[in-house]
Amino acid sequence: MPADPASLIFAKITYMEDTRNVIDKFKGRSETEIVKELDAADHGLVIALENTERDFNMGTIVRSANAFGVRQIYVIGRRQWNKRGAMMTDKYLHVQYVGSTAEFVELMRAEGREIIAIDNIPGSFNMAETTLPKHAVLVFGQEGPGISEEMAQAADKIVAIEQFGSTRSINVGAAATVAMYCWLQQNVL
């Protein structure tokens, strides 16, 4: 079988010439090769982002997801999002766009995934006291409004990150990073 043309091009790039935002072991390798290796190491964490307005935090969440080995991200609602904060890390993930919350919920139910929404609304469970299921999808809302009412109703559980200061909430990009790491602590590390 002939080599992937992208592999041939990237094979010519030396370690020092590769300025992409990838860890050292991926320097000089094609996007296809990197995605294949990451897919082979998939630990099962899936996330979803409600995208009702253009939120700069989505790029931050996608970048953190990549760092934590997330392979699948669902973007619910608008297809357009600010990719600048992702620092091109979205190229190494599988991003699937879903038109509505109802469509997303149906898809997750068909996959047998538990929907765990992350938000600090009344009735949410404390993260430190919650077991995050292995076969779950962590859902994050928009900065400001948080998860939608429809998502709150559909979620199997809503989990809040405990806070100890005076602010009403932490930034959704920071909250997503904390929640993904908690899932990893419970299911992988």
Regions of interest found by a model, annotated:
Residues 2-189:
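Post-transcriptional modification and biogenesis factors for structured RNAs
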